Amino acid sequence: MKDSGDSKDQQLMVALRVRPISVAELEEGATLIAHKVDEQMVVLMDPMEDPDDILRAHRSREKSYLFDVAFDFTATQEMVYQATTKSLIEGVISGYNATVFAYGPTGCGKTYTMLGTDQEPGIYVQTLNDLFRAIEETSNDMEYEVSMSYLEIYNEMIRDLLNPSLGYLELREDSKGVIQVAGITEVSTINAKEIMQLLMKGNRQRTQEPTAANQTSSRSHAVLQVTVRQRSRVKNILQEVRQGRLFMIDLAGSERASQTQNRGQRMKEGAHINRSLLALGNCINALSDKGSNKYINYRDSKLTRLLKDSLGGNSRTVMIAHISPASSAFEESRNTLTYAGRAKNIKTRVKQNLLNVSYHIAQYTSIIADLRGEIQRLKRKIDEQTGRGQARGRQDRGDIRHIQAEVQLHSGQGEKAGMGQLREQLASAFQEQMDVRRRLLELENRAMEVQIDTSRHLLTIAGWKHEKSRRALKWREEQRKECYAKDDSEKDSDTGDDQPDILEPPEVAAARESIAALVDEQKQLRKQKLALEQRCRELRARGRRLEETLPRRIGSEEQREVLSLLCRVHELEVENTEMQSHALLRDGALRHRHEAVRRLEQHRSLCDEIIQGQRQIIDDYNLAVPQRLEELYEVYLRELEEGSLEQATIMDQVASRALQDSSLPKITPAGTSLTPDSDLESVKTLSSDAQHLQNSALPPLSTESEGHHVFKAGTGAWQAKSSSVPTPPPIQLGSLVTQEAPAQDSLGSWINSSPDSSENLSEIPLSHKERKEILTGTKCIWVKAARRRSRALGTEGRHLLAPATERSSLSLHSLSEGDDARPPGPLACKRPPSPTLQHAASEDNLSSSTGEAPSRAVGHHGDGPRPWLRGQKKSLGKKREESLEAKRRKRRSRSFEVTGQGLSHPKTHLLGPHQAERISDHRMPVCRHPAPGIRHLGKVTLPLAKVKLPPSQNTGPGDSSPLAVPPNPGGGSRRATRGPRLPHGTSTHGKDGCSRHN
């Protein structure tokens, strides 16, 4: 048994804890003089005035101290433990020594830090809890022995706190120089609860007395020693034992008799406490002095002798200094900080305590050799049986009957159960054989111990017999000298008769009794050994029989391959399922993306239609357009010429078709819902077309979501938007229903929304059945129009607004002719839209399509006449009215339904020079009443739709309504206001003197 381990230098760790100021100190008028600056620095200020302050500068005489870690009154017990002691536990388990001690004057919280309370346990309890937790975590690989001793040094006398009846104990030094306490009680335990109970028992035995400075003053130094021995569970001929010791010391505080007001016994206790602390301070001073190699006097106090290894030997040491922040304890705090600062310079030489223990080498060597031979024999047998099995398999490969018999043999459930039972028997035989070998080993160890004890007792008896014969010889010599003159016969008789009987000592009698018991035990051990050897031979024979039986009943390599292939098939099935799930997720994501692209394409088509219609109105009326809007329109034209978005759409359609043709599971697209319309008959008529076009039509665009708009409404349009009117009911003007089903249910409105829609048309061909159904739906529309024609014949023409421009009549005529030549309904998708239908939009057909007066007045900056109203003649207006009236009478017999884009949730927006991006996207606003006070910023914003006007209603002075330009009374107001609705035929006069009909 010897110590081993490499040593290394370790710096002594010093921590400082400043306790909170007490109520008694505040009542005495004390002030705070100790402050924590950061995690390591503490400043102590001198409360007294400087007697050498000649210049009366009153400079602060403060001094800063730097430690490894500093705590103020806000620190908790857990924080102190984590920063100081927790790191020592791993080293103690590994075989290193460690020491933690609290230092400082009386009443500064040393006992509170070390012991704590039930609610806030101190370092003792937390360290022991973590120590046993760490032992439990590694107990599977290591064996541990934990022992504990608890003592106190009271008046320079050592007392055992676990067993106070032992009295005062003495310090001794063993052969290695380690200080030991003779007769101390060491309690071995591996249970945390038990060691906590012992700790509480020792604390109750500790000496505590009240003083004027501290009501619970500790009158002794308490030392708790925990020893941990660690050894590996794997047995070997050489075993390594690691022994670590942990010292936790609660020192008594230094005190002044003037402060504590001690008398008698308390004063003697204080003197002894101060003496031991003075010796500790001298040791700290000597150890911290780097320049001198002087002698360190540890013998001045028993405390310093116990702390010899902790201060300058083999230990990792942590010193927790405690001070009071009150000005009344300035001197004690300064001395404590001084000694703590010096202790930082102390270095200890730490090494691991390793004990190498040699056991019975010859015995363990023979056992290991037997086990290795057994392993080699089993390996050879397995190899031989494997070779015979392969050779037999090659010989019988062509024998079909043998193969069938073998398959039937291994396919039955009974054979499988027999194989499992055979394997279990073999495993149990090996386990029993190992147990018997282990018991034989234990018997051998016990027999050797009995033999050693027998030899020791025999030596004791032999020594006594030798002593007895020596005494008898000496007595005979003495008798021979005394009776030299007597007769020889008398001498012989005297010596034989008078020789005293020598009493046998008790240890010899005990040895004789022990020898008898040991002889009996040896006989029992011999019998048990013979029985175990016989059992071992039987188990070996049983194992050999099982080893010979198992190869004949075990399956071939093919069965093992089948089992592995089945496992592989299962793994591949799992992987295949995962791949299918990933494919489904990817398919769903692609289809959602395709739906989003289709929705954006519909939105783009609607925006193209709106942009082109508004541009046609601007060109027809020569309206002034801001430069910003012109630039944006040029960008738009370039994008149309490039056709990048159409190409992207075509690629998306090709990708979607390729995805549909794949073998992955299909995702059914959501059916498009038909937007409710006020015209119930129109909805019923178009429902058949919508059912056939459901797979190709897109879902309706939400007019409320701003996220999909190309142009988002700005803040300036919200007021007009809030005053807008929802989707109007059908209004009849001259027996005309001016509302139809929404355009999103029509395939033609989706494809023909842009000039380049022929490419999209070619991508979605219509079958003969679909064309026939569309034609049937169109005939239904014409039947409905014929029914309404009879009602229109009996209704007189309404007084509509008077025309104001030449373009109104021209556009009316062109629209009427274009509508006559073009069949309505979804058949319009067969050819590109007519430029006349797309761009020839005037105020009269717009008003007739919605049944309302124009909702917007066109204005520009300034109060002069508008560009498209210049040169207007009243005579031309009268002639135009007469010609229109004649046409209306001539073509009254012809009547058809006016269809228009469904206007759900209309919006009102204003356009300024820098507000082109705020235009509403796909629903143009239509208001019921004119807004006379609107001042526009250079662009006409009108509702756009494919308008069909009946020629029978286009004659007369009230058929068309001009774009009214109301006056701007304020001259500078840009805010849209709603005025009272004026009756038909009234006129307003602007500042330019021109008459405008409302």
UniProtKB/Swiss-Prot annotation:
GO terms for molecular function: ATP binding; ATP hydrolysis activity; microtubule binding; microtubule motor activity; plus-end-directed microtubule motor activity. InterPro entries: Kinesin-like_fam, Kinesin_motor_CS, Kinesin_motor_dom, Kinesin_motor_dom_sf, P-loop_NTPase. Keywords: ATP-binding, Cell projection, Cilium, Coiled coil, Cytoplasm, Cytoskeleton, Microtubule, Motor protein, Nucleotide-binding. One of its GO terms (cellular component) is kinesin complex. Residues 662-676, 684-697, 746-761, 836-852 have a biased composition (Polar residues). Residues 482-503, 662-706, 746-765, 794-911, 948-998 are annotated as: Disordered. It holds the Pfam family Kinesin. GO terms for biological process: axonemal microtubule depolymerization; microtubule-based movement; plus-end specific microtubule depolymerization. Residues 360-391, 424-452, 507-552 form a coiled coil. Residues 482-494, 989-998 have a biased composition (Basic and acidic residues). ATP binds at residues 104-111. It is found in: Cytoplasm, Cytoskeleton; Cell projection, Cilium. Its main location: cytoplasm. Residues 11-346 form the Kinesin motor domain. SUPFAM superfamilies: P-loop containing nucleoside triphosphate hydrolases. Belongs to the TRAFAC class myosin-kinesin ATPase superfamily. Kinesin family. Plus end-directed microtubule-dependent motor protein that regulates the length of motile cilia by mediating depolymerization of microtubules at ciliary tips. This is Kinesin-like protein KIF19.
